[in-house]
Amino acid sequence: YDLQHYFRMMRDEGCDYVVMEASSQAFKLHRVDAITFDYGIFTNIEPDHIGPNEHADFEEYKYYKSCIFKQSRVGIINLDADYADELLAGAPCKMFTYAIDRAADFMADNIEHVNCPDFVGISFDVSGHTELEIQMDLPGKYNVYNAMAAISVLSLIGIPHRAIMSAFRRVHVDGRTQIVFKNDTMSVLVDYAHNEMAMENLLSTLRELQPKRLVVVFGCGGNRAKDRRYGMGKAAAEFADLSILTADNSRDEETTDIIADIKSTLVPAGGHYVEIPDRREAIEYAMTHAEKGDMIAVIGKGHEDYQEVKGVRTHFLDREVILETAAKYKL
């Protein structure tokens, strides 16, 4: 009952709302038992988190993802997501929907990218249950979906329209599509994308900004489902001009073995790559070999401030390394 303890502490401090992420593992391992959510949101699902330490197969994963509706007074679902109709039909609570490509209770359209010197974002209109004009410093269709999930809840609990629009103009998510360094040659950003879907969403969005080259620096976590490595290798081959393969949190595995798994799908798909296992050196290579007009995406860790190798965590923050590299080489 750790969660209940923390909820009580929050209430004692005057907190009225709690926004939390509940993973499929949380439902499987009973971490969120005895909790009724006022609003439960289902964003999307893909074949991930399947392995000895997570879920036995996709059906089990899907089942535990859907358990959120059993513990919610009101459910909200992305109607464009795979299996949305199936989950909507089986939901035991009152449901609302949001979408871009289908008719829903909350719909987004007129989506436009905004690319300014110090701002890479998106604007769109909301219609249906409410009408809003949204602009935010987070680009990509996938971020529109994330915003629509939040907008659905905010509208249903009665937050004024002006407050919602104002909040989105100021929204910032640490380590998500975060531009860290920019000069006349390159733009360098960090993002937490650490599986195939997230990587495809990010890189396809950055492609729409039409950089001369799209360079991605990434690895994969050790002791996690290997399918992530194969999926990210395919995504890199499809969307990146150059992949710099490096360490993430290798944990108990060898970084070179993880990179070999990534290469097993990246190379057959025609992807170009450089292999630099040391993450700092990989970032330095990307920035010191940049060509005019390059966009460099350092992904997989986002806001994380550590690297875990052989059970030891050491301080490592991608954005610090990017800024240190810029200063070191006077970029």
Give, region by region, the residue ranges found by the protein language model.
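Short gly/ser/thr-rich secondary-structure transition/capping motifs
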Residues: 1, 20-27, 56-60, 169-173, ...
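Conserved nucleotide-sensing/catalytic segment adjacent to the nucleotide-binding pocket
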Residues: 1-23, 30
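Short, high-confidence coil segments that cap the C-terminus of an alpha-helix
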Residues: 10-16, 72, 211, 293
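Acidic, Mg2+-coordinating active-site environments of NTP-dependent enzymes
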Residues: 11-13, 38-188, 263-270
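Switch II (G3) loop of P-loop NTPases
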Residues: 15-25, 187-194
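Short beta-strand segments
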Residues: 21, 44, 78, 217-219, ...
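Inter-motif core of Ras-like GTPase G domains
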Residues: 33-45, 211-217
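ATP-dependent carboxylate-amine ligase
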Residues: 92, 129, 149-331
